[in-house]
Amino acid sequence: LHWAELVSGQFFQDHQKRFQRSKSADQMLLNNLKSVRQQLKKLQLDYNTIHDLLARIIFIQFLFDRKDSQGHPALNQEFLDHLHEIGELSARYSGLPELLGNHRDTYRFFRWLNDRFNGDLFPGKGATEAEREVEWRTEEQKVTQRHLNLLAEFVSGELEMETGQRCLWQQYSFDAIPLDFISSIYEEFVRENTTDKGVHYTPGHIVDFILDGVLPWDSEVWNIQILDPACGSGIFLVKAFQRLIHRWKKANRGAEITSNILKSLLERNLFGIDINPQAVRVASFSLYLTMCDEIDPRRYWQEVRFPRLRDRQLICADFFQEDREGFRTQLDSDQYDLVVGNAPWGKNSMTPLAKSWAKANQWETSYGDIGLLFLPKAADVTKPGGQIAMMQPALALIFNQVGTAKKFREKLFSKFKIEEIVNLSALRFGLFKDAISPTCIITMSVMSPDGEPLIYICPKPVLTNQDDYHIVIEPQDINSIYPQEAIKDPLVWTALMWGGRRDLALVRRLSKLKSLGDMEKNQIVVSTQGIIRGNRKERDETLIGKRILKQFPDETFLFLKTEQLDINNDPYAERPRKSKSKAFESPQLMIKQSWQTKTKRFRAAIARLDQQTQKGIICTESYVSVHVDETDLSVLEAACVSYNSKLAVYYLLLSSGRFASYIPEVKPKDLLRVPIPKYRVGLLNNIETIEDVDLYIRESFSFKDSEWILIEDIFNYTLPDFKGDNSSPGRQTTRRSSKNNSESVLTEYCEYFVRVLKAGFGQDKNVCATIFQEHNTAHLPIRLVAIHLKGSGTEGVQIEPIDSPTLLEQLKRLDKLFLDKANQDDGGIFYQRVARIYDSVQLNGQTIPTIYLIKPDKIRYWTRSMALRDADEVAADIMMWRSELDKTSEVMEESSRG
């Protein structure tokens, strides 16, 4: 195993089957818990009691497995014997399964544990002794010996699961229960019994990623107030608790953190809200386990007293309630230093209280989505200068262009300083197993904007099982967006998701060109989406007898032979409106709304009419029909060429939020924004192949070489990588495309890199490049290229062996550097997987400034468009250093004069 196989991700890609999350021990135990839960339900036990019992036996098993510094568990057979000797238990028991076989002793043991630990794990939390006793007796009557026998079989490993196998309980080690496991219990148990589909479990590594930005480990500030307004399983609060503990230890070096200090942190520094009472139960349990994790088990019985959290620090309520202390907009303003969490969202997810709050505070949202409202409400209860870091719906926050969405975005970005937005849209299938709509993370400060740009990060999937455990952020995934851009220009979010500043500039230019949408505003064209049958209550007799396009025939290219289409005999259609019926008249251009996987393009064709279709055809809702007068037929021909071209794919990926982040289908309004070329009569007569289409588009729009490269690389690599798998072109090695070690991919990369530097600093500059290639050794999963900035007697691109002693020594140093940085907050190549090193080398007796570029051996890192971006960044660095050098020189001159 070579170090580079790990840092590049190649090892995990080659051995994916060995790292399947579904076969991990915690996932298998979770399935066991689901099974026993259903069996208890069949025995007429309610879910609330089932959840309490399961949490209780997990905690008790934790006590059996958790060992102190001398290797002794907190609970064992000797301890149970002691409880018998002092009269707490009526008999001696060898372990938990045997104890569960006695209903009376089981509940005596539960009561004894409650006296020791207090907290919310057991019943009996009423205000008076009588109320507490009623709670205990109610549960004792509900839970029968049959229920306890089932649990005894379960924890002994004898209970048969639905799969026919025995359960895993005995093989699982409970001394260090993963947080993700507790969260998974929440996801599986709590969400299964709710109609609230806007709630989404947050993977642990995403929580760590969010907290790294707002609550990093390397600080001694621990006395801060943290709120999670939609706490769910409590994973944000638990991980925040762990970080506060770490900070306390750092601030009190040498001091031992006691149970009382931990209890104080829970009671004073952490606050959670959730509308689901089951979520509050799970969150409380998670925090108790975290507290126990910090204390030596020898001290459990003398020191540990869990604080009451439910209805105190963990509130079951709607965050938009204004009558509960702790999160009232006015009375509790400026209370928290930090608000974190994963807000629920979704169409029509708004609660009545949220609607009232939004109206009273003048915040509008789109489609009844509650998610965005958590941001301004959180800001109201956060101290000035405090921070908010929450997961949000990406479509609603950054992509949606309806009026209410624009107003919300403008108000939010104008009122608060937005620090960072991490667009996780490309990762959604890896992050969430139910593939919910795209999500993002927003970090904002409760202060007015200062004009500084926000950081916009769009990580991409590695397409290995690594995606289940961490996020890979590479340099090309990071862009800066200025506040006014964020407010006024919707293109920044889509263009910079898949491209860079050059792409944004090109898409902005293309958006100003003529399109069918513009021409419809000028009443030159009429368009409509195809018929939507809907509730089948509306009849339109004019639809009968027309041919209907349901799917383009395979051989369709530019023209549609309508005689191959079926005749429609169904008069029912909810849409389009009859005012748009002219769009179904001839001449017609039919445009497919979705990107085609097979051709990697969109598809459009002009309807060629037969005797049956002289007055036009209709189409299904997956198509758009565009009509013009006969005199403007050349408009449709020009548009037809554009929609079949690489340009349409490029433009729509970088301008349509739906296509860029969600599904490969574009809404009609976005589709009609595609720029169309110059139109002329008989345009299609000279176009016979798809290559002719692209050639005409390139010539008609007068694209520069650097612009066409952007279009081609998005088409050839970026989009197939997003919609494809490991076999997509951009994920192949650079060597696969080269013959006889010619290095065609890297050579083109270097040539365009050099071209950019010469364009910026002068064609007379002798900039050259070296591609390093292994010689008589196995191929590394990374590539190394050097760009030399001064004359060395050579030009162009050279290929050199990588086995020189000096270079190998340098790679060894890099090896150590990368591995050392892999565990640091800033990541290094294990996370960023790319390095750019500024150095100098001796060539022909000269000291030559040199830039080393080290990236994974995948084509997508070495495309021509990536060369343009990398060279732009290098040029910017050089200009910045020159500017700083000039300033230093001026200061030195002034000093010498003085």
Language model: regions and residue ranges:
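Short, basic/polar, glycine-containing "phosphate-handling" surface segments that engage DNA
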Residues: L1-S69, Q141-S183, E192, P461-T464, ...
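Signature of N6-adenine DNA methyltransferases within the class I
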Residues: A4, G9-R18, Q44, Y201, ...
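Structural motif
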Residues: K41-L54, S173-D180, T365-S366, E585, ...
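P-loop NTPase catalytic cores that bind/hydrolyze ATP
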Residues: L45-L80, F285, G341, D380, ...
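Long recognition/docking surfaces used for binding and targeting
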Residues: H84-V190
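Conserved S-adenosyl-L-methionine
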Residues: T202-D323, Q392-L395, T404, F408
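Extended amphipathic alpha-helical segments enriched in small hydrophobics
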Residues: S233, L237, P668-P720
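Polybasic, glycine- and aromatic-enriched phosphate-binding surface used to engage nucleic acids
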Residues: L372, A379-T382, R502-G682, A759-G898
